[in-house]
């Protein structure tokens, strides 16, 4: 957690409403940090369904493996998250730590260990002493309440500079349902079917299979379209929980993601995911500029995504943006190396709506002063038009600054 808040942090922080069936509490367990909270317990009422998507890393953490296995049951009663230690690449002791954490949480709230979901973030390769949770989780279970969403988001931070929360309220049938979310990010972010640590909660009565389908579809153009440094974490976890409490107010029970009654809910659900994903991009380690990459005119959407990611992950492109340089030559380089169909002589590039390159060469109307003024702004849009088809996609990233190097050079110090 940095004491210096990113200049890209949202200016408006939403008031997070209560969600029936969800209680939260945080504490300082002394996992790594001093003088701050580092463990979160979320308790959910019986009947809560769960869905999740996780890292594709072949070196997944022990909590990720635990959650993947328990997700088969489709039900959840608790979520335990710790910051400061990722419990990744920790061998047999890592699995034992995950098991002990789940057992302690289950004892604290009175459920089965298989109904406890886990997430850890922090340093990789250091054993997690789960005995530090003994007693702490019991106290959290007693202290848990329906408020405290911002405190929860703060407890899961590592190098983040601000807590990330989002909320939406929508009608399901004739009843009002709420969707709350929190996330943490900052570095080692290039998600694939998941991201960092993100948790979504709703009181909508959704089956586990329905929730899973919504989550899997929702991450495609939100969390999976964000990259900070091109590195996919061992711990990426996105979990969604539905308590179903809104059924008491007349919300219909939904078992299929294709149910037309879900239309407004899906829109709101995806909006929460998109909001959190953008906050992650805004809080990239050392970031001073939010960068939106749009690729259009590609052969396919898949091709457009790959080209957009090639641009977004290029250190040369990102450092040019940090230097407020509209260096379209580096964008051309990134397009060319993406391995996707592209025609140099059809390529056009613009920065914040000002075209700098057209038909494979510098735009005849290029004005250095005009473009330089745009590059000083905190939000930069790079649009690439390939002129080959109708494929289009969008990716969010940030610039690459000296501070990113400093943060990661000192991370274990």
Swiss-Prot record:
SUPFAM superfamilies referenced in this protein's UniProt entry, alphabetically: DmpA/ArgJ-like
Pfam families in the cross-refs: ArgJ (PF01960)
Binding positions for substrate per the UniProt entry: 158, 184, 195, 285, 408, 413
Active site, UniProt feature: 195 (nucleophile)
EC supergroup of this enzyme: transferase
Feature type site, description Cleavage: 194-195
Family, per entry: Belongs to the ArgJ family.
Identification of the protein by name: Arginine biosynthesis bifunctional protein ArgJ
Naturally occurring in which organism (per UniProt): Rhodopseudomonas palustris (strain ATCC BAA-98 / CGA009)
